[in-house]
A protein has these predicted regions:
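Eukaryotic phosphotyrosine signaling hubs
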Residues: 6-8, 80-84
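Exposed loop/turn and edge beta-strand positions of beta-sandwich/beta-sheet ligand-binding modules
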Residues: 52, 80, 115
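Core segments of cupin and vicinal oxygen chelate
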Residues: 4, 10-64
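Vicinal oxygen chelate
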Residues: 1-2, 8-11, 95-137
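Helix N-cap motif at beta-to-alpha junctions
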Residues: 15-16, 89-92
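Acetyl-CoA-dependent GNAT
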Residues: 33-35, 61-62, 70-74, 107, ...
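Short amphipathic alpha-helices within nucleic acid-binding modules
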Residues: 22, 92-97
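Short hydrophobic/aromatic beta-strand element in the GNAT-like acyltransferase core
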Residues: 55-57, 66, 85, 118-120
């Protein structure tokens, strides 16, 4: 038996409806699953963009790593690094696209000494993400 990958990572948000809209409309991530609006409901009955349930999964690709937008009742969102890195094949174009949509960046895309390009951006709750263009030989 071995670990074969990462299935889901969680991002704590202050409002899952607003976060769902931002992650889909601004970042362009596809919805993988929206859970039922009521806790302990039949999991086959999905929620909607207007009335999302506690469990929201975003993501695509093979293998797919999903992002769970998690609104914790009674907990304050603590802004800071998430450790989550989004990949792109053209960081300069993606930086410009996201900037036009109002995304706040901590820095400009920069080529690192090992050949990858990186920059950091924030969601509306102050969660920090990396944007990376892999080294292209």
């Amino acid at each position: 038996m071995t670990i074969i990958g990462i299935d889901t990572v969680a991002v704590v948000v202050s409002n899952r409806r607003k976060a769902l809209q931002w992650f889909t409309d601004v970042l362009g991530l596809p919805v993988a699953y929206i859970g039922p609006a009521e806790p302990n409901s039949n999991p086959s009955v999905q929620g909607s963009h207007e009335n999302p349930g506690h469990w929201i999964e975003l993501g695509s690709g093979r293998p797919m790593t999903r992002i769970h937008l998690c609104e914790l009742e009674g907990h304050r969102v603590e802004p800071g690094p998430t450790g989550i890195t989004f990949l792109t094949d053209n960081i300069l174009a993606e930086y410009e696209r996201l900037k036009l949509k109002g995304v706040r960046f901590k820095n400009l895309p920069k080529e690192m000494e090992w050949g990858e390009w990186l920059c950091e951006f924030l969601d509306p709750d102050g969660n920090e993400f990396d944007l990376k263009q892999p080294h292209q030989p």
